[in-house]
Every structure is written in C-alpha cells, then in structure tokens.
A protein has these predicted regions:
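Functionally constrained cores in energy, signaling, and assembly domains
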Residues: 36, 40, 108, 121, ...
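A long amphipathic alpha-helix within ATP-dependent nucleotide-binding catalytic cores
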Residues: 8-31, 61-128, 164-192
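Internal metal/ion-chelating core segments
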Residues: 1-54
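Generic structural hydrophobic/aromatic packing signal, biased to beta-strands
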Residues: 26, 38, 51, 117-119, ...
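Glycine-centered flexibility motif
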Residues: 1-4, 23, 52, 62-63, ...
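C-terminal active-site "lid" helix and adjoining low-complexity regulatory extension at the edge
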Residues: 138-139, 143-209
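ATP-dependent carboxylate/phosphate-activation module, predominantly the ATP-grasp catalytic core
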Residues: 2, 40-104, 136-164
Length: 209
C-alpha cells in the first residue's frame, strides 16, 4: 500500500466481526532489509542465547524464500550474549528482542523452551532506517537445527563459551556440502523440488571473541 486511500479501501472490505475475531496487523514495508534472529533455547539445565542473521535464497519456482540462519551462540543467558562484541545494528536487535521477551514476565507460569524473535532492519517508504521485532516464534523453526547443534557442542565440551552454527536450505541439484555438516534432507521434495537441508558448526571458542 502506498497511501491512506489504499488502506481505507482495504479496511472497508473487512467486517468488524472479522477484525474483532482475528485482529489486524499492519507492517511497514522495508527495502534493503536485513532480517536478524535473536533468541534463547533451553533443554533441561542447558541454556544458550544467540543472535544472527537470516539468508534469503531463490527456490526452484523463482521465488525468494528463507534459506537458513547464521547464529552466534553463547552458553548462558542474555547477560552473556550482551558481553559479545557486535555491531550497532546487531546490538539494537538484541535490545529490542530482550524488551519483547521481558514482557512474558507479565504472564505467571509462562514457559517456552525456545524463544526466537525476528527483527527487520531496513529503509522505509520515507527513506528512514527502521528496526523492530516483527515476529515471535516459540516453537521449532528454521534456525532450530543450528540451536541444537550449538547445544550439543556445549554439552560435549564444557570449556566452550561461544559456538557459531549455520542452518542451510539449498534448492536445485547443484549443491555444496561442507565437511562436518549434518544432513537433514537431500532429495526431491514433492512441493519444493530438489532440496538440501543441513546444519554445520563453523566455529567454537573457549572464550568470548
């Protein structure tokens, strides 16, 4: 939508009952977007917290889709993550995700073993740089395999403090699989066609970088 008139025309098509039942979400359209993932995953007494970026790829039908995530994971919680060196945009994304996450404290007894927040950063229609959380995911998602790979690495080596892990989704028959990757799927998908999905730990440090 490019203006208020288009928005009004769209809203006129919706009934009040639909809005009351399903709600209405409006998002700012951004150009030159970077999508960042920030979150926390806990299994048993083991917790990691992470930040990273998502990858966009072209699928077998010519559409731009999610192609995986590159995560930097720390052992522990938000405080440990914030000790890592990171650029200004990444630090803002972590701050915004943590603010969003803090609101779960308003719901006594709330528990989510995975809390992932997607933050969009880009240029709006007026040429201004914007950043904000546009999705919260408290279920398994595209980056979950990278999170699990980091958890496993931390479990296998108690001295590790930082793990960088990547989840990858590649379309087509020309694919590259790096050494040490765990392959989840490498075949023809009935809907997506030739598809490769794998996860790999790319770096592990015994102290913060």
């Amino acid at each position: 939508m490019t203006g208020v008139a288009e928005l009004d025309a769209f809203l006129e098509k919706l009934s009040l009952e639909e809005i009351e039942c399903h709600g209405l979400v409006l998002e700012t359209n951004l150009c030159r977007v970077t999508t960042r993932s920030v979150g926390q995953t806990m299994i048993g007494d083991r917790m990691i917290t992470y930040h990273g970026t998502q990858r966009a790829v072209t699928n077998n039908h010519g559409s731009t889709v999610y192609g995986g995530s590159d995560l930097i994971c720390v052992r522990g919680g938000w405080t440990e993550l914030e000790k890592l060196p990171m650029d200004t945009q990444a630090r803002l994304a972590v701050s915004q995700a943590r603010t969003y996450d803090r609101n779960t404290d308003r719901y006594p007894g709330f528990l989510a073993s995975r809390r992932n927040y997607d933050i969009g950063q880009g240029i709006d229609g007026r040429g201004r740089w914007r950043s904000g959380v546009f999705e919260a995911s408290w279920r398994s998602g595209g980056a979950s395999t990278a999170e699990l790979a980091a958890l496993m690495a931390f479990a296998e080596d108690p001295a590790l403090q930082v793990v960088e892990a990547t989840s990858v989704k590649q379309f087509g028959r020309r694919t590259t699989i790096p050494r040490g990757a765990v392959i989840h799927f490498h075949d023809d998908d009935p809907e997506d066609g030739p598809l490769l999905r794998y996860t790999v730990v790319t770096r592990a440090l015994r102290r913060a970088a």
